[in-house]
Every structure is written in C-alpha cells, then in structure tokens.
A protein has these predicted regions:
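Glycoside hydrolase catalytic-domain context in secreted enzymes
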Residues: 1-215
Length: 215
C-alpha cells in the first residue's frame, strides 16, 4: 500500500525526517534530494510500504496557497531539475539492477497538474491559465518524472479553467496517456473524485472514463 512519505518516512517514530520541499529547493542540489529520496524509500520499505506519494511537483505561484511549502520552487526549471532525481532516488534508475528492488518503492508524481497555480492561491481551487502556461509553468516536472520512469501519477484536487482534474479526460488520457505515452498507474487523491458534478465518494463513473485507474 502507499502513504505520504514525502520528506522522510514521517509516519514512523524514529525514522529520519528531512526538511520539507521548500527548504530542499532552496539548496539547489539535485544530488542531495536524490540521496534523501533513497533514504526515504528504504525507511518506507522496511516499514512495510510499497509506494510513496512523492514527489510533489507543484510550482507555487502565489504564496497565499497554504501548501506552498510542498513545492520545491516557484521556478519550473528548478522543479524539473529535481523531478528525475527524486524519482530515481525512490525507485532506482530504469535499467539498473536495483530498479524497484528491495531498497526501493514506487514513486508518484503529484498533484497533476497546476495545483500551485490556482486563482488567488486557493487550495483545491481553479487554475485559470492558458494551455501554454499550464504546459510551460506547471508541467515540466512531470515530463522529467516520466523520463525517469515514474510508475504512478496522482491527479490534483484542483481544476483547470473550471474542470476538475479528476474528470478531465483531455489531461488524464489525452496528455498523460496519449501524448506522453505513460503506461503506468493514475491514482486519485483523497476522495477528490467526489467533487466532480454528478459523482459521490462512493461512485464516480466520470473519473474512470476520464482516465483515473483508482480512486
């Protein structure tokens, strides 16, 4: 099963806790975050986990967003430079003998996409931006995570121009599956599918039809 071990296996007393992502981003050191991800993966694995919901690849554009600290930077280039390092630290490098080996767990690139760009920084809000801005500001980290072989992607609670990401087929299927050729697993966030019009937490055909594999 999976859990939020984002900056260390913080769910277990005695595990190693590292600075949160905003602090790690200030270090401007991909090699450091790779090593941190390796430790996090190992301590997650020995506590019985197979999957961590990390890395967070948000690109916060408004400091009023209450989850700004979860992003590495407001600069998409910095976020992109960290994405592959964290994914490879968690899972290992594709083709290497230890890829998804006994010291590794599955990574999850989250929260797709634009959660750091919502109007007025509102949590679970609406990113009222153009397709070009969504692509150029908020997506580069995901592209690098895909190149590094990330096995899962988590959809965001937020919306893009009024459409909830959990029900946005043009993004979940059109971009992730068709454009980026991702053949891994797309997972929902905590009952976020229930916010799609016509859905409940218990039932949401629209999310599955949009491309979500599990909610």
């Amino acid at each position: 099963f999976g859990i939020d071990a984002v900056h260390g296996q913080s769910n277990v007393v005695g595990a190693t806790i590292f600075p949160h992502n905003i602090g790690l981003g200030a270090a401007r050191n991909p090699d450091l975050v790779r090593k941190i991800a390796e430790v996090t993966a190992l301590e997650a694995r020995v506590t019985g986990l197979d999957w961590t919901f990390a890395p967070t690849l948000a690109v916060p554009q408004d400091d009023r967003w209450g989850r700004t600290y979860e992003g590495y930077s407001e600069d998409p280039a910095i976020v992109a430079s960290y994405a592959a390092a964290v994914v490879e630290g968690i899972q290992g490098k594709v083709g290497a003998p230890d890829f998804l080996g006994p010291r590794r767990v599955l990574a999850s690139a989250k929260h797709f996409v634009g959660d750091g760009g919502t109007f007025e920084g509102r949590d679970q809000g609406d990113a009222q931006v153009s397709e070009a801005e969504l692509r150029d500001i908020h997506a580069p980290g995901y592209v690098e995570a895909m190149r590094a072989g990330v096995q899962t992607v988590m959809a965001s609670f937020s919306s893009w121009n009024g459409v909830k990401h959990h029900g946005n087929r043009s993004l979940l299927t059109g971009v992730i599956r068709d454009r980026w050729n991702f053949d891994g697993f797309i997972v929902g966030d905590w009952n976020a599918h229930g916010q799609i019009p016509g859905c409940t937490n218990e039932k949401c055909v629209a999310a599955l039809e949009a491309g979500l594999d599990m909610y």
